[in-house]
């Protein structure tokens, strides 16, 4: 069966454009690996490729959740693995694209996750809504100091997950960490990155464009559909900052600060992505700067040649 290709790397490096070019050349189908692009309606703030720009190519794992639902790596893994197996069985090439670190790792490698229980999780999510993330994190610290030490006091999603696992297993959270198995499909993993100064400029321009294209209106609409109740979606970079600005009155100053904080939060996230992906020796890193001269077409040609050689096709 066909060998998948994964296009990974930090935010704003041009992964989506490269994935489109690869899928078109190989007759492939695109599989999203960006956690926030799983959500319907979260389009501008996640830089989701508009349907009119998808070149008629099949896209999977986009717009599969309401903003009130919680995205989990385990659920994503189950659905995405089945999707890729189906694509391969039909003789097509899966082109995986995204920058959500654990989602990509759990997809490309055989991770086994501890049990989950929607009712238990819902109870802890309700507790989070009642007392706030700081107080809930303090409860985690009382139950499992080691877990609290590695989870940020502002990370409500991971705090809830830790408390859920502790309740279900009766063990410390660390004892229930995912078991990492072997690679699934011998995927060709391509990483795209830029020099830091240039990537910062791309992030700034993307952030400005988001706000110019109606990002605030998107958040306002999603709030009317329950975004505030979404444990995962409401904490996405950009969305959380705009929600706070709207709560502060939505004035020009508050929204300008939301824009600045979105930029800062994205840069911070890029550092985490680089650290995570940089540890994977399988990644073939390509310089995003080459897009400036040859466009995604030039990079795609190089990747396709490498893929054909390694796949003996």
Swiss-Prot record:
Residues involved in substrate binding? 11-16
What's the cofactor? Mg(2+)
What sort of enzyme, by top EC class, is this? Answer: transferase
Q: Name one Pfam family in it.
A: IPPT
Positions contributing to ATP binding: 9-16
UniProt xrefs under InterPro entries: Dimethylallyltransferase, IPT, P-loop_NTPase
Q: Which reaction does it catalyse?
A: adenosine(37) in tRNA + dimethylallyl diphosphate = N(6)-dimethylallyladenosine(37) in tRNA + diphosphate
Source taxon at top rank = Bacteria
Q: Which GO terms describe its molecular function?
A: ATP binding; tRNA dimethylallyltransferase activity
Q: Where is this site: Interaction with substrate tRNA?
A: 100, 121
Q: Could you say which protein family the record assigns here? A: Belongs to the IPP transferase family.
The name this protein carries in UniProt is tRNA dimethylallyltransferase
| Gene name as annotated | miaA
């Amino acid at each position: 069966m066909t060998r998948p290709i994964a296009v990974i790397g930090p935010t704003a490096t041009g992964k989506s454009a490269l994935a489109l070019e690869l899928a078109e050349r190989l007759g492939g189908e695109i599989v999203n690996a960006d956690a926030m692009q799983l959500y319907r309606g979260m389009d501008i703030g996640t830089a989701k490729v508009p349907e009119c720009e998808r070149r008629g190519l099949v896209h999977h794992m986009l717009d599969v959740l309401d903003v009130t639902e919680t995205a989990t790596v385990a659920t994503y893994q189950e659905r995405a693995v089945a999707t890729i197996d189906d694509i391969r069985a039909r003789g097509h090439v899966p082109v995986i694209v995204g920058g959500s670190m654990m989602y990509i790792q759990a997809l490309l490698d055989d991770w086994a996750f501890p049990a989950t229980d929607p009712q238990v999780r819902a109870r802890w999510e309700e507790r989070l809504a009642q007392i706030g993330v700081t107080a809930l994190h303090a409860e985690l610290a009382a139950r499992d100091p080691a877990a609290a030490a590695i989870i940020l006091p502002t990370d409500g999603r991971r705090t809830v997950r830790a408390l859920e696992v502790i309740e279900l297993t009766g063990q410390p959270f660390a004892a229930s960490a995912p078991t990492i198995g072997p690679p699934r499909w011998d995927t060709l993993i391509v990483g795209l990155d830029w020099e830091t100064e240039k990537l910062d400029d791309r992030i700034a321009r993307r952030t400005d464009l988001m706000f110019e294209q109606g990002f605030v209106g998107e958040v306002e609409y999603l709030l009317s559909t329950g975004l505030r109740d979404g444990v995962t979606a409401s904490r996405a970079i950009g969305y959380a900052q705009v929600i706070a600005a709207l709560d502060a009155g939505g004035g020009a100053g508050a929204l300008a600060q939301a824009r600045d904080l979105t930029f800062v939060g994205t840069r911070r996230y890029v550092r985490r992505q680089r650290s995570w992906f940089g540890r994977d020796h399988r990644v073939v890193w390509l310089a995003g700067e080459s897009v400036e001269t040859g466009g995604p077409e030039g990079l795609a040609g190089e990747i396709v040649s490498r893929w054909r050689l390694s796949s003996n096709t």
